[in-house]
Amino acid sequence: MNSMKKKALAFAAAACAFGMLLSGCGSSNGDSTADKGSNVITAYNSEPQNPLIPGDCNETGGGKPLDLLFARLISFDAKGNASNEVAESIKSNDDATQYTIKLKDGWKFTDGTPVTAESFTKAWSYTANAKNAQLGSSFFSTIKGYDKLQDGDKLKGDEQLEGLKVVNDHEFTVDLNRSDSVFAVKVGYTAFAPLPESFFKDPKAFGEKPVGNGPYKFQSWDHDNQIVLVKNSDYKGNRVAKNDGVTFKVYTKDEAAYADIQSGSLDVMESVPASATKTFQKDSTVQAYNKAGSVIQQFTIPAKLKHFEADTEEGTLRRQAVSMAINRENICKKVLNGTGTPAADFTSPLTPGYSDSFKGSGNLKYNEKKAKELWAKANAISPWTSDDKLTFAYNADGGHEVIYTAVVNSINNVLGAGVAATNPYPTFNDYRTAVSDRKVQGAFRSGWQPDYPSAENYL
């Protein structure tokens, strides 16, 4: 928890990302956990969008605690290297259409029940089953029988993926519907975590008080305030906790979290408010770390948005024009003060196969003249009127306000006043709920922190 990421900024229809990891040096006010003699780490977080269920989380507010609560078949180190965690071995056939997975003996959930092969197969099937409406369902799409579990109206919710076969308590096989050489790495993602029998008896209650098998165990969740985890002394894996616990403190303003970092009442923060990007690395009250990372931030323009339809000439022209109208270099330099870099790919420089010169990457370069030409061509097809506006939705509690203000200003300066406007939501939870419920009109902020180290996961 001591490394800070300098996040790549993607604008393939994209906005900006920023954020590092900071740790507080503490202060003389006696409020820090270290001053109280406790070996508990306090970490910055947002309120999770959903209950704490591994297969129903696709954002960091829930992802960070879930990662510590659940051990998967494999785990990753800080450099993205994989090693077996619960798995004894994962072997594929020659064409990577079948995997045989063996488990280590002795693993238990924090309720004392054993982790078995069925703990994985039932959990994966539950997440894949459309009746259960889990956000991580698509991660199981390459497993045989996935398509049969997608008509939620005809399902009960307990149907199993036919490609999963339990051999015994410590072995199961996975038959895929196509070759998938990345599957052995993919299973390190949180959605592939095992679940105890108590989950299936009452998923709703479980989501409020999860039972895992990871390096930490759940203690409490005070909504919109904090999530408290304590060290799991029975954990048998390769991520043994070096402290007594982690308390995730929920913030709606980065500035408030940064002030707590400075005072010593917050230990770790992975973002920097815009007001501090010039000074944080010289601030004696914090320990700052600023290196290239694997996170990208972007915005999404819906495929059927008026004037931006993805399958039309007008839509293609306008998407290119908007992208070229955004001065990424200027935003990174003047708004983010060098704490981010413009993205030149849909992945990050740390991802195997990354390229900064792929076909079409010219659309990610600021080109005022070309942007105006493309916009004019689009207008010749279907005029942009005073009633039209491209809005950008984002959560205002994560430091995105200044970034999207700069994005909108850049677009309007090139394509004309009033073409674009901001559409902020108060909190990340409000924002993600609106996105998930498809209530956002216009473009919306998105981003990706890789679930496993592969270009496939970004794409």
Label every PLM stretch briefly.
Residues 102, 119-122, 126-128, 132-196:
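Surface-exposed binding/hinge segments that line
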Residues 116-123, 169-175, 214-215, 243-245, ...:
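Alpha-helical secondary-structure segments
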Residues 170, 176-241, 245:
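Gly/Pro-rich hinge or "lid" segments in bacterial periplasmic/extracellular proteins
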Residues 199-207, 234-279, 294:
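Ligand-site clamp/hinge motif
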Residues 376-450:
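Ligand/substrate-recognition segments at binding pockets and active sites
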